[in-house]
Every structure is written in C-alpha cells, then in structure tokens.
Amino acid sequence: MGVQTCAVAGRGVVAYLLAMTAAQNDRSASTPSVASAHDKILIVDFGSQVTQLIARRVREDGVYCEIVPFNKAEEAFKEMKPKAVILSGGPESVHEAGSPRAPQLIFASGVPVMGICYGQMTMAAQLGGEVEGGHHREFGRADVEVKAQSKLFEDVWSSGSKNQVWMSHGDRITKMPPGFSVAGTSPNAPFAIIQDEKRKYYGLMFHPEVVHTPDGAKLIRNFVRKIAGLTGDWTMRAFREEEIAKIRAQVGKGKVICGLSGGVDSAVAAVLIHEAIGDQLTCVFVDHGLMRLNEAEQVVDLFRHHYNIPLVHVDASKQFLGELEGVTDPETKRKTIGRLFIEVFEAEAKKIGGADFLAQGTLYPDVIESVSFTGGPSVTIKSHHNVGGLPERMNMKLVEPLRELFKDEVRKLGRELGLPEIFVGRHPFPGPGLAIRCPGDITSDKLDILRKADAVYIDQIRKHGLYDDIWQAFAVLLPVKTVGVMGDGRTYDYVVGLRAVTSTDGMTADFYQFDMKFLGETATRIINEVKGVNRVVYDVTSKPPGTIEWE
C-alpha cells in the first residue's frame, strides 16, 4: 500500500524518509529480531498490493511473520528458519521472461507452503505443473465450489458448498503438479484450490487475506494452526519484555531524544523507551500551532506529569504560522512545515546536547515499503514531510522499537503499557495538522474556528457511541463564505465540511452513513456554538475516487 505524505502523527513525528540508506539497512540486518524465540512464518512478496494484509491476518492469530521480497527470500528463509511459508500474489505472469520464482530451497525444506494467486501459479509451475496465461481472467467476486475435504476447510467450508471469494488473476493452472489434487473450482478456474496434503502444500487462486473473501481469515488460521501446527505465542506482553531488553542492550548508558507529535506511534515509542532506560530519554514536543483543541496541553500533561518523562515543549506556533502566511498550495504547506520542523527540532536537540540516539516511531509498513518487491527503492514511496535526513544530519544512531509492528499492534502495545484510551484509540491525524484541513490560506482566526467546529463534531460522535465504529472523522473549514440568517440579521460566514469514513487500512474507504437526525443535530450545534460558521455540509465521497483528507 502507498504511504500518504501527511502521515507524521501516524508514523511518529520523527519518521524518516522511507527509502532507507544502505547504512541503515546494514544496521537493521545486524539487529536480532525480537521474535527470534517465537514460531515464525515467512511471507514471500511477489508484488501484490495486499501482501501486508496476509501478514496482518497471521499476526492477528498470534503468530509472528515477516514479509521479504522474493529475491531476498532464500537468505531470509535460512536466517529465520520459519515453520511455514506463504507465497503472495503479484502482478506478473508466470509466462513472462524473468518473472519471479520462489526459492527451491523452500520446497525442499519440508515446511508447509500456501501459495496465493501468483504464489499458486509459481508453486504449480516450479513443482512440475503447467500454467497458461492471458485466458479466462477473473477479477472481483466469484464463487468457489468445494470438491474435496481439506484441513484448510475444517470448520469453515463443507464439501459441495459454494463460497464467495475475491479473484484477481490472469494466469491459470491447466495441469496440476504430481501429488496434487483439486479441492475447489470456480466457473473460470477448474483448479481454483489445489492441495498436496501429504507435503502440506496448498494453492489458492483467490485472495483469502482481503475482506471480500468473508471466510478468508479462517482459512489462513487453519493453515497457521491446523496445518503448520503453530500455537500463537506472539503477544504484546512478550513483545514489551523483549523490546525493553533490546533497547537496554542497544542504548547502554547513552542518551536518547524522541520527538512527540501527540499521535499514538510516537507516544507508545516514548513510553516503551522510558520504561527501558528511564531519564536517559528526553522527549521534544514541537507545537506547530496546527493541532486540535487542547491537544498540546494534553500531550504535555500526559508525558510531563503522568509519566514524569523529561520533556522539552517548544511553542513554535508563531514561527510556523508566519511562514505559512499566504501559502495556499497543499504541497507547499507540507514542505514548509517539514522544513521548519527539522530546523526547530535540530536546534532543540543541540541545546540538550550529548544525545547518542534518535528514537523514531517507524512501523513495519514503513520498513516493508522502503524496498519494492524487485529489491530496489519503491517507486510508490512519497517522502515524509517532517525530518528527512535528521539521523544523518545529527550523526545519531536510530532507536526504532516499533519497527516490527503494524498500527493495530501499536495500539495493543499502548494498552499493554497503560496509555489512556484517548491517546491509544484516537483517529489518525495528519502531520501537517489542521493546515491541510483548512484549504486555502491559513490564519489564526480560521484555525480557531476549525478547532472549535472539529471539537463539537467529535464530541457529538463520542456522545452517540460512534467513535470506535469510524476509522477517521474530522471537520474541514472551506475557503468560501455563504449568506445566512441568524435572528433578524444577515450573516456572511464560513462553511464547515464534515468528513467521516470507515476503513480497515486507510487505502480504501467508504463514507460513514450517519443518521440524518445526527447530522442535523451536529450542524445545529456547530452553527450555534462556533462563531464564524453559518453552514455545514457532509462529504459523501469514498476513496477512491477521493482521498480521506481534503489536501
């Protein structure tokens, strides 16, 4: 999946450019995984846009897994010694010259293997089957009919049943490899599911990892638990203990600086590091004046007074707003904010002095996306707008305690660490903050209006018990004014747009279908309680074609 350039809070204030340097890659490779003592599954990535969903499904079942590009899979297999392997889908055709293959070492090892889409095709071709390309393509929903019993289907699908799945393939198998049999068919795929239960090989032409295959997560669970025999010992409690030991070993008696954004990633990283090394950690919170109502005060109170973590609070709001005056282009806003953040953060770090390490809230998707499945820098990467090359500029080593976690796992870890739910469960917030929720030029007055309108909107959502049902909700102050009537007088005030979406990963999203009574009540409250607003509209655009944020 791609990475939005507005993801500072989601990735941690000091997340670096995703295209990591060779030196950083060398450092990562030499650092033992905290999962070294756990059962592991290796996921070989052939370039599917949903490979990360496979990993999330496996992790949800309590089993640690890692994603590696196909051309690094042999090395990873030898190092990890996984108990099972999953071959992902991908955009290539098995018939194309130079198309990727799984290492033969995997098939010679005796571990269970599940091939998904392209993974099924290359498994069949490599094990002696035949595959043809370009005919009878299937994309979208399809029904698979179960033709034989399988451990993969236990307590999920019964023989003869038809079940909805999500197809996305061009190639198809025409002759099975020796030892395989048909377990399921679809109208355009007579070998939709194949298996060799003796060797524990399973091939699926559909994608079990996506929500459009309703029983897909159960099929993956059966592969993980019943076929591979893994028990699920990957927990946030275990991760917490192991990562604390790892941080202590890495840092020793050194000093660490961590940037706080108010987002969950940087908050969890800071609390975990502080638990490991205490006051060797100093946090720097740069308030750019673009945060939500009372958010800066909440961050300072939590870390300085609740956790007693050394915190430098820098109110740079005048500097940021001064530089943003008259700026209307969204990308220029981002770059301006990013440049200023680097300048302010670097200046404060120099004042602290003597720091050996820079802590970052890098997540596992950042690590995955730093390299494409072909092994080079991913062409889909967009630069984070915040710190760029801070680690290199400041000659500091990196501490990245969350680099093996997905976002939902970070939230679980936050709860394990005892962070308040208002921090752990809050909706994603863009790094440029309200700057990209205020299209057009930015002023202090506009930001005050937007903060208050957003606070009323979120308060309404919480009061109606809807907050946890929504992926992200926020208000936007539109750069237009409209005529209204309040009392006996004419008004000419701003329009507020309301946005709320449901999503599983932020890559696609549907607008949340509020009850009209709720929208009416919310609009009335905003107009009555927020001076400068006389009209409220609701955004019913899905993603795609729109994006979640307006800028």
From Swiss-Prot:
Record field: catalytic activity:
XMP + L-glutamine + ATP + H2O = GMP + L-glutamate + AMP + diphosphate + 2 H(+)
EC number(s) for this protein?
6.3.5.2
The entry's keywords = ATP-binding, Glutamine amidotransferase, GMP biosynthesis, Ligase, Nucleotide-binding, Purine biosynthesis
Extract the GO molecular function terms from the UniProt entry.
ATP binding; GMP synthase activity
Q: Which residues form the active site?
A: 117 (nucleophile), 207, 209
Q: Which Pfam families match?
A: GATase, GMP_synt_C, NAD_synthase
Provide the transmembrane region boundaries. Answer: none
Report the residue ranges that make up the Glutamine amidotransferase type-1 domain in this protein. Answer: 40-233
Q: Which amino acids does the record list as binding ATP? A: 261-267
Q: In which pathway does it act?
A: Purine metabolism; GMP biosynthesis; GMP from XMP (L-Gln route): step 1/1
Where the record annotates domain GMPS ATP-PPase, the positions are 234-426
Q: Which GO terms of the cellular component aspect does the record hold? A: cytosol
- Give the matching SUPFAM superfamilies: Adenine nucleotide alpha hydrolases-like (SSF52402), Class I glutamine amidotransferase-like (SSF52317), GMP synthetase C-terminal dimerisation domain (SSF54810)
The GO biological-process annotations, alphabetized, read as: GMP biosynthetic process
- Role summary: Catalyzes the synthesis of GMP from XMP.
User: What is the annotated quaternary arrangement, including any partners?
Assistant: Homodimer.
Q: Please identify the protein, giving its name as recorded.
A: GMP synthase [glutamine-hydrolyzing]
Q: Please name the source species.
A: Bradyrhizobium diazoefficiens (strain JCM 10833 / BCRC 13528 / IAM 13628 / NBRC 14792 / USDA 110)
What's the source species' lineage?
Bacteria, Pseudomonadati, Pseudomonadota, Alphaproteobacteria, Hyphomicrobiales
Q: Which gene encodes it?
A: guaA
